[in-house]
């Protein structure tokens, strides 16, 4: 499968996607560049699908990827399994939406908002 390198090494790219995925789960809406959003979409879709499965192995797989951050009184993993995943119980994929905002002022990079549907 093709992917974008995002100008980073593989470990930096993985760290970036972990951070963005955790932020998207916690906030349910983030603003980033178009390429980062396009790379983030399949990662988050897989995490939500694991959340829908809901068993112990799925929870451990998500825990190995998502950062240990608090989302209010819950952490990101709890929020994924208790709030986000049940919302999509009847939906077969397509959990995210990307909306274009326009070019960023400093460097002209195309900025988008990626959010959970």
From Swiss-Prot:
Q: How does it assemble?
A: Part of the 50S ribosomal subunit. Contacts protein L32.
Single Gene Ontology MF annotation: structural constituent of ribosome
**Which PANTHER family does the record match to this protein?**
LARGE RIBOSOMAL SUBUNIT PROTEIN BL17M, RIBOSOMAL PROTEIN L17
Alphabetic keyword roster: Ribonucleoprotein, Ribosomal protein
Q: Which organism is it from?
A: Exiguobacterium sp. (strain ATCC BAA-1283 / AT1b)
- Family classification: Belongs to the bacterial ribosomal protein bL17 family.
Which GO biological-process labels does this protein carry? translation
From which domain of life does this come?
Bacteria
Record's protein name: Large ribosomal subunit protein bL17
Instruction: Check the record and name the InterPro entries matching this protein.
Output: Ribosomal_bL17 (IPR000456), Ribosomal_bL17_CS (IPR047859), Ribosomal_bL17_sf (IPR036373)
Q: Which GO CC terms are listed, alphabetically?
A: cytosolic large ribosomal subunit
Quick check: keyword Repeat in the entry? no
